[in-house]
Amino acid sequence: MQDIRVAAVASSSRVGEIQTNLENIRQWSAKAKEQGAELVVFPELSVTGFWLHRDAHRYAQPVPGPATDTLAQLASEMGVLLAAGISEECQGRYYNTHVLVSPSGILGTYRKTHINPYESPYYYEGNSLSVFDIGKARVGISICNDNLYPENLAVLALKGAEVLLMPFAYGGSNHNLWLASSACAAYRTRGLDLGCFVVAVNNAGPVPTPDGETNRYPGGAFVSDPEGEIVARTQGMGPGEKMLVADLRAKALHDRRSVPHFTLRLRRPELYGRVSELL
């Protein structure tokens, strides 16, 4: 790993208003670039918006497709890497997907692997845990509910991930309460256990939906280091859009992983078979 500067943007994504959302991504990416960011991370379904409804699939996009082409164009114009969420249509199936885009095109895609009961009528599960080399670091992506499964993230780390991107559409309206929640503490602990940086970013709200309802999100983002300590977090009380910029220092990762008692080095896989068995 080499030092890399990242931005996490707690953006507000309008359901189905893809061009509006892409323009918002462009504007925030430009602000991040002005502050020297090399990788800009956006929340879950940030391109298409998050809507659990039978009509939501009308907004799903092919990957690659026009929306990801626009992301690649933005990445090329600004000379940054972008990570953004999209409702993906593939051969009649729909996936909650995050795409990693470089100036030369799509570097990789990740489909959410742990679909909760509220989402299962609308999305299929992904079946792959991949790590992507972005030049200065190797990153893994784990979307919202996926981050409640330590095994998911452990596999990414064992495959070489140094940075874990965690995009969310986690409900609520209080920015500070979300960042102080036991859930966010758990996400930081995943980074501590695995010796990884964590870049977590939530949707901002409120966001009206086409059926007259309102999705409420607290906004917010944080970066924690391989010791599980917060190195940057968004500020302010309200749920509006926010951005942080943070430097991920390679030395912090090296120091955490070089200690004799580093957890991954002392694993006992022969004892863990039950973890892979269904209840």
Model-inferred region functions:
Residues 2-6:
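Extreme N-terminal starter segment of soluble prokaryotic enzymes
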Residues 10-15:
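Short polar catalytic/cofactor-binding loops
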Residues 18, 26-107, 170-194:
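Cys-nucleophile CN-hydrolase/nitrilase-fold catalytic domain and related Cys-dependent amidase chemistry
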Residues 20-29, 149-154:
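Short, acidic/polar
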Residues 63-81, 148-241:
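CN hydrolase (nitrilase-like) catalytic-core segments centered on the catalytic cysteine
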Residues 84-86, 97-100, 130, 221-223, ...:
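Short beta-strand scaffold segments in enzyme catalytic cores
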Residues 89-189, 254-255, 259-262:
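Active-site catalytic loop in hydrolytic enzyme cores
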Residues 251-279:
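A conserved C-terminal secondary-structure "cap"
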